[in-house]
Amino acid sequence: VSARTDRLVSAAALVLGALPLWVSTHLPMVDLPQHLHLISALHRLEDPTTLYPQLFAARHELTPYLGYYHAVSLLNWLVPLDTANRLFLSAYVVGLPLSLAFLLRGLGRPTWPALLALPLAYGDNFGWGFINYLAALPLALVCCGLFVRALTRTHQRRAWAAALALCLATVLLFHVQVFAFLALALPWLLLTTPVPEDVDARGVSARLRPRVPALLGVVPGVALFLAWVVLRLGQPSEVETGAPWKAWGPMLSPRNLAWKSFAQNRAELLEVLANLFRDGSDRWPLYAVGAVAACALVLGLVRPAPSPEGPVARLRMPGLVLLALGLYFLLPFDIRGYTYYLNTRYAQLAALLALASLPVTPPALQRVLRLASAACALPLALVFGQGFRAFSREASEWDVLVEATAPRPRVMGLIFDASSRVVRHPVFLHGAATLAQARGGGTNFSFALTPHSPLRYRGTPPPTFPSEWRPQDFNYATQGVAYDHFLIRGAPPSRVFGARLQNELSVAAQAGESWLVRRR
């Protein structure tokens, strides 16, 4: 009965963890409008009622973003796009604790700390809309669990190794930065995980033989990664010093790398775990997690239970934590022209692994800790549900502008103020993509410009200013003539267009801080 109760409590916590994704019309994720626009274009690439066939073509090459875009596009055949995306995000939120439990069970450790992962699903990476990266995290934890099983489950090694091969390749198809963590994590697990045959093994070959299936399981993923590296690095990178979104020099040259100081990284390590809402309310679920973890740490020291792991195997989880922290503190923030916001993303992974490293306590205490961990989902559902609904009310200005947008629009986003009163991230930055996606049009800035997108422009991309962050560089004569809709936020249209507003342009709608200007 107690085991059944534990399962019901855990299931309820998982439902509460994903609930905030379903209580609001809009989600506060900076890049989400861009993602949905590209998925819509991918799904309707041959739809003549849209601009997509004219603007975009499939990029028939290996890119690390294929996983998210194609998964949601497939779901879109069954349900509307927004619902498909929420189902995908729900799978990520629920998958985070489930994958952590899978890893812990493979290591022979108690699984109750996995539920503490739920509040960590909604942090800085979520606010920026790094959905590909987020989706790769549960898959990476599953890879670690599969790798350990391929080493230790003597009669099922081939099956676990085959599953590992598939999962590792899938990680790469979601995000290469998570794959980079596994490039360090799997060798560490190989070195610290004993196999049953070690007891009687004599010589290197005898120790290596039972590990061969696990090693073979990583070969397809590594081969896929090398193929992508050759393809990516073989493409010429456009070098323009000082230009946004372009390399400033050779890939790893000092001028092409942007760093955060150690002090800044240290200060942000805990902050980025809960920095979504301006009122700081999202810290309360994290405080609850911290309180449970602190109690578990004290109980593990005062009333320790025999560890199921040997002295070397006991180092596996702390080692994984140190690897994630090393990536956080030692990597650059940007590799210009290649990848951005690099090191800060690993804070979430380090925190997840740290929670999984809590000391083992007696079974009776583990049940209490499981209930306490599940209880952390209550403030999570309340705080994030309220916060998401508050943001959705603010973002309803998009809905008004969509109604005033014509079919097949060419929308230029001029976002002078991307900020929100509710969330800290600049969530209104890509509002033009929301209008374009709703009406089957195009925008002045699209992720189709990036080499990791599954789509590319058919011809020359539409003219625009160098960075979506700098609308003050907009030039109507050379850029504006290519568009028939203009989304302006944070500045009156008269300041942007002057006399043209009375002649060739007119205000079609205004809501909140945004205006929609259309060509007459």
Where are each of the predicted segments found?
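Short hydrophobic/aromatic helix or loop-helix immediately within or flanking a transmembrane segment
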Residues: 37-44, 56-81
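Short periplasmic/luminal acceptor-recognition loop of GT-C membrane glycosyltransferases, typified by
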Residues: 391-394, 401-491
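Signature aromatic-anchored transmembrane alpha helix within multi-pass, membrane-resident enzymes
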Residues: 289-292, 356, 360-385
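Short acidic/glycine- and proline-prone juxtamembrane loop motifs at membrane-interface regions
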Residues: 128-136
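Transmembrane-helix motifs of polytopic, lipid-linked glycan transferases
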Residues: 87-107
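Short hydrophobic alpha-helices at membrane interfaces in multi-pass membrane enzymes
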Residues: 149-169, 205, 209
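Transmembrane-helix signature of polytopic, membrane-embedded enzymes
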Residues: 3, 100-121
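Transmembrane catalytic cores of multi-pass membrane glycosyltransferases
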Residues: 22-34, 46-48, 65, 167-319, ...
